[in-house]
Amino acid sequence: MTIKNLLRKNIAAIIEKKQSKKSIYPIRNIRLDSNENLFGSPLAANYHQQNGDLSFSISEKISRIKGVPTNNIFFGNGNYEICNALVSAFCEPRMDNILICPPTIEIFEQIADIQGVAVKKVLLINDYQLDIEGIAEAIDEGTKIIFLCSPNNPTANTITREDIEILLNNFDGLLVLDETYINYARQRSFWYEIKEYPNLVILQNFDIAWGLYALNVAMAFGSENAIEILQKISPERGVSKASFEIIERAIDNIDQINQWIKDTVMLRGFLARELQQINIIRKVYPSETNFLLVRFSIDVNIAHDYLLKNGIVVKNCHNEILCENCLRISVGTLQENEKLLKVLKTLTL
């Protein structure tokens, strides 16, 4: 199977005729082709220049960290841009559809709605796992993409590998797996399987574990065909040179990042155990992320407002399907977690 067969006809034609964005020039040259500012940048860095080979340099470093070849890596301006490109490439408006499994993040449905692509929904079951039979029944010839999050947001759990593999082996379309929180999970990433499954695209980013949320830079891992498609239909400018330079510095501090991940997991365990001891909390769901989904035995709106009154902001998930009476609570510093616990213990009805 080649995913190019799934492309919209007009997109396939664009990809066929479009040359690679990367041009090769001599090391020393006079660049009079890009309309850059001849005086340079008012900043110390050469921000008047285009990215040049910086994206390839970052690809090489990420390749060494993750063990994925550079031609299986793509960088985009956030998960939204990459997902938007994939829906544009594979889904014919008013004809095709995507499939999602709520509760999950909103961007998949939002992108489809904007592009006039129908959305099929199959709810999670049994501790927020996939309803494989329900998905099989919902899929039709117009289903081009299944979007999943593992670990999932807001439920915080990973999807079982066996279920994901069932979909990869039996679904003829594209499976996009958002692994934004995979750094905090015990389950290993699916990037090792991209050679085995040409219909798999994995999304990760530098937002959370890397601490670079402000940059809004994401990575896609997939087959060479998938990466070529993304390269040829994505915006010409792509990720900024300034963002790549910051990412490069962060990569040089990978040991610090890995330590922060370990510390977050430790604090997550502490917070989960302590929350479960509070009498107004019914359940703290197992987490493979940097947040906890917590179900309350009292009206969750009261708990949410009480925390807010005491200067603590959390996410109220009560109106999300299958998350009734739940708050999503990010793991904070030890001091922040202790204050949260102290405030919740003082909440009486």
Give the positions of each predicted feature.
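N-terminal "arm"/small-domain region of PLP-dependent enzymes with the aminotransferase-like
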Residues: M1-R64
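Phosphate-binding glycine-rich loop
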Residues: F56-N97, Q115
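PLP-dependent enzyme catalytic core of the Aspartate aminotransferase-like
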Residues: E162, K309-N310, E320-L349
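Conserved PLP-binding catalytic core of the aspartate aminotransferase-like
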Residues: V265, I278-N310
